[in-house]
Amino acid sequence: TDLDSRFSAVRAHTALLAAPLSAEDCCAQSMPDASPVKWHLAHTTWFFETFVLEPNEPGFEPFRPAFRVLFNSYYNGVGAQHPRPQRGLLTRPALSDVLAYRANVEQRLQALLARQGDNAALQALVELGLQHEQQHQELLLTDVLHLFSGNPLAPAYRDAPPPVAAPAQVQDWLEFAGGLCEIGHGGRGFSFDNELPRHTTYLAPYALGTRLVNQAEFAAFITDGGYRRPELWLAEGWDWLAAQYIEHPLYWRHAPGGGWTVFGLHGEQPLIPQAPVAHLSYFEADAYARWAGARLPTEAEWEVAAAPLAPALLAPADALRARIEPQAAPGSG
């Protein structure tokens, strides 16, 4: 079935994302808000075992009872959890045990789908699990990025792509009339509860930039003293800046001889002027927008602007395989 094929593809893609990593990489935790790759691999499996297999598989037996606590994240309704800041201490189970756990649950779930594939409630649970796992695919990469950024060897998760060659287009503005607009999920496909219901909201007229802010533009903000000017920052953002001694984006580094390098999943690379700036905090993005004489768009403004392009904006299931760093759209520089 289509659902069975999607299940296999999503699970295989998670394994593919982990494939370039060593067992040591998969166990490390760089900060309390991050999780080890091994934990992501196990937790996404725990989700299917707990919420799909346990209530639906005849004679259900857990792969390993202790995993119910170790790999629960925050689902209080199904029991206790291992403390998030201590996930990096889980040197056991070994990575090989977690991969065996994944294989076991996958085989059992596919057998369940073969028997009960027309069960609408079961289909909905599996779909939720797939959406959940795809979220963790993104989290896995962001956690690897933070982990590798703290390594003095500056390791690359993937070989560097060719640099962006096209010059950036002049920033222009696309105007929107605003008014009463429909937002929220309104189709028959999957949605999370916070995307519902579809409803009407009022938007004042607004405009969006025709391309992303690039690294050269953000470097100009830094050069102009952007991190030293309190009038550009929200009060909470300025407090964060001072408390953490923030002087530039998290993954930017001073290059020998001047200028900047930017650390990413392709390792440490020279700043690419026309490449989109990424990995900013909300406070940094807000301060830049104020410096540039603009502001950040609201969620509703983004949704209304993107709605006519929705089919083209849907990422293919293997998008993270083809491109793991933000890039400018064709023709925009």
What kind of feature is each model-predicted range?
Residues 1-26:
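N-terminal regions that are enriched for targeting/export leaders
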Residues 24-80, 115-162, 166, 174, ...:
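Short, contiguous alpha-helical
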Residues 82-92, 115-118, 196-202, 260-275:
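Short glycine/proline-rich turn/loop motifs
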Residues 129, 133-135, 139, 143, ...:
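Functional-site microenvironments in short loops/helix caps that host divalent-cation chemistry
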